[in-house]
Amino acid sequence: PNQGTASADYIASKGLATKVAVIYNSSDAYSSGIYDNFKAEAAAKGLDLVASEAFTGDSKQDFSSQLSKIKASGAELIFLPIYYQEASLILSQAKNAGITAKFFGCDGLDGLLNIENFDKSLAENVMLLTPFAANATDETTKKFVAAYNAKYDPSTLNQFAADAYDAVYIVKAAAEKAGVTGDMSVSDICNALKGAMTEITVDGVTGSGMTWKATGEVNKEPKAVKIENGEYQPMD
């Protein structure tokens, strides 16, 4: 959910738009949680939320109704706190509808460029906040990217791969903090890990100094990137 707050802050601070619309998945906790935080922060930052359009897991193919309302609203930017599969359809349908608004998303959009047969030109200038950018120049990222590309298909490298890599070491750090041993029951291990997660700080590929709340929400700084010529480029 904190991605919603960060996205509203970034859009407002960079002057990307004043009239903003949102398309979100009301049946998904990730999407609706980000939307709720975005809505609150957008109001605090003076952004005009001119349209909020929802869909559900059962209605994620045809977005013509949502896009028609958004086009009529005069939105300058459309915020997409959703996953890349639905985003690819929205981008295609938005083009067909003659929508020229900017698009901005969160880490769920990472993977958009890897969709089979997706026209990458539809994603040109799409902006998003993500915890991982493969072309970052810090040593941690460079080492991870080199190791990943040596073993796997480089075209599959995205923030989900980086998240999975970090997750292994995060659980390891929590297990060590909790003193987990092999003779403990599964329920005891789970309870021990939940307690330890709020006490550890982890440096990883997707963030430095990562910490966790009791709710499981992670605290880490996302990176802003824009898709240009089929590649992620860092933004200020």
Where are these regions (language model features)?
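Extracytosolic ligand-binding ectodomains
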Residues: 1-236
